[in-house]
Amino acid sequence: MLSTTTIGFPRIGNQRQLKFAMESYFKGDSGEAELLAVAHKVQSDAWALQKAAGIAVIGLDGTLYDQVLDTITWLGAIPPRFKHLSGLQRYYAMARGGAALDMSKFFDTNYHYLVPELGPDVLGPATAGPPLQPDFSGPLDKLARGQAVVGRDGAVPILIGPVTFVSLSRGCELPLDQAVARLLPTYCALLQQLAAAGAPEVQLHEPVLATSEGTGMPTEFETAYAQMAQAAGSVPLHLVTYYDDLGAAYPWAVQLPVAAVTLDFLGPPGAAVPSQTLALLQQHGFPADKRLGAGVVDGRSVWKDDGTAVALLRALLDTGAVSSDRLVVTSSAPLQHLPYDLGLELEAPKTPEATAPAARAGRPPGFAKQKVEEIVSVARLAASPQPPLLQLVMAPWCSCSGCSRARAWRTTPPTSRLSGSAAKPYDVRARDEQLQLAAFPTTTIGSFPQTAEVRRLRQQLKSGRLTQAEYEGLIAGHIAHAVGVQEALGIDVLVHGEAERTDMVEYFGMQLGGMLFTRAGWVQSYGSRCVRPPLVVDDITYRGPSTCWEYKVAIPTAAQPVKGLLTGPVTILNWSFPRKDISRAAQAMQLGLALRQEVAALEAAGCTIIQVDDPALREGLPLNGERWASYLSWAVDAFRLCTGVAAAGTQVVTHLCYSDFQDILPAIDRMDADVLTIENSRSDKPMMAALAAAGYGRDIGPGVYDVHSPVVPSVEFIKSRIRSFVDSGILSGRYDRIWVNPDCGLKTRGWPETIAALANMVEAAAQARAELQLAGGAAVAPVTGGVEAAGKGGAGQCRRNQPLRGLLPLSCLP
């Protein structure tokens, strides 16, 4: 049997114990001791599970919020505004305080990390040493606890490598090599202490190597790893990479002074370009003095392996570059991106809402626990000359032939968009046919607080204690309340509050054909927030309106316009577990077509402003920049397929979450949305400056306060944000096209803080109008768009009818 290891596991617990412990601590209902007890138990259980499955060497994963924040803490790279605090108070202030660290997506995943700040006040000026205040108690304590659970020989610390850490940071004024050099003494000191504590090896995770930027960092890596290898002494260093192949970095990366290198042999599920790792190894070989960690069990997909893993391992052995005693089987990425245990799903009681995935298509998929077992099975089978259990263990489930019934027009890149009159450009439709609002119009992103009462109603519906009619009647009351609050506050464009939605992707997954959803398939998004990604198992089809009822409930109680709220096709795809038998592009087009029909249904119900959130657009970018153009082409086409049916008088809004957008602004412009709202509250001026410099010319809502913090922003704070938008020069002074809104949905906030924050937001917008001597007050200006204007151009007068490559044939459009 080949050796095995793990490089990460879900950190929240099999029943989300850590999530609930954190939330209790945040509310003040429990103390530090209770939180740590739960966290340590969750970690110990995960390590014990991996040991029981037969894993030889276990990566000691686990965090109280975020692994990058953990690194900031043990490095002592603390921004000055937090240094007056200590312990967990400081840790969580950096995560969710009033001036918290920025948040961004971790490479191309749906996990959010806290962005390190490495300016001169953290790393020190160029001529001085770093004022770091390292604290190694966390990593050393975790190692000691891991050794107690799995033994000294099997407990391996996991650290984010120094080059990746600096690459993830912001505010650093030093060149990359100098910034890394500032951190190396602290890394070396920790490695020495881990060695003294008996660590058998140390995993250093460097996913930046899989990016285009990483290929240009050989000097930084060689210098850093030479110093760390010397400091570690006899303790081996294990370089771990994942999320894609290393491309041009492979030849020099595998020669770094480490004892082992783990490589991703699979890449992103459904990617247009398959992983090139095996080809790179066949071309360049592999050092004879190193162990190879073969990431052949898919750590980002729930589908069972179809024999690919064993075939890859045998191909590796056949090259002669790696002997069986130097080959270690592992996952292609940390298993934190998967739900915890399929067994929990199969044991859950069946309800009208959720059915165990096995009920749909025979053999079930595998979650993190099953992937650990698969690692062991693959290691055993690959070493066997005649693996009799291969077909049994590796039988495909829905990842290949089981899903190949897609009609040609659903999987073949479509060729055209729609017929009708000539396109109306943004300036014409915005001026002549859409809502005309006061300067600095106010709105929210969509969701309002999800109270215990709302969650209880959903649970009662699932359990049969409420009928659908009873449930809808009670939800209608919550919608009326949300609308009433907004009108009382003077908000210009309203939302219904999304009381009926558990999650922006899961909700639509339940409404569309071809998708399955779970009851226990929770995955950490950030901190205490968890999501349940749907599983795409078949052609995605439209089964009827899913948002029109809520819109119609909101309208009678609203004097102001109400937005229709949808999740966009790329976000649904990127935040689901996609199929592997057809491309992601084909699945995105299926989603675009289905959502297109929902846009048409909302318009038919009288909706004249429709928000299609596609916050995951950027995170789906391939790590290799050479593959960006292809991805952005089909991703934007899918969005436009969804929204292109809207009339010129219907204002289309989109929302993009924590990401850096400067390098994809042309693609954002090609989306052709009338209003762009972005999660900019923690990024502040750089994003606005980039948009202004690029000549962005459509309506924009940059986000005036951070909804991820419970702190209520003051009127003056929000006003300062509005002034910064004006000062950026964006839109050349067209203040009527700068929207004032929170930076994201309000689902996780409480009602008191929500009302207080929104009241301050409305007042700040009114004061900004007055100070800039603009007309409009706090009320909505006369509407020249609206229901009457939606059909102004006559039947078939759609917003953007220019031909698009890669869209559906005319015969397929509704």
UniProtKB/Swiss-Prot annotation:
Binding locations of 5-methyltetrahydropteroyltri-L-glutamate: 19, 110, 503, 526, 529-530, 575
InterPro entries assigned: Cbl-indep_Met_Synth_N (IPR013215), Met_Synth_C/arc (IPR002629), UROD/MetE-like_sf (IPR038071)
CDD domains: CIMS_C_terminal_like, CIMS_N_terminal_like
Amino acids binding Zn(2+): 655, 657, 679, 744
A single BP term in Gene Ontology: methionine biosynthetic process
Residues binding L-homocysteine, per UniProt: 445-447, 498, 613
Leading EC class: transferase
Binding-site list for L-methionine: 445-447, 498, 613
Cofactor(s) listed in the protein's UniProt record: Zn(2+)
Family the UniProt entry places it in: Belongs to the vitamin-B12 independent methionine synthase family.
Name of this protein: 5-methyltetrahydropteroyltriglutamate--homocysteine methyltransferase
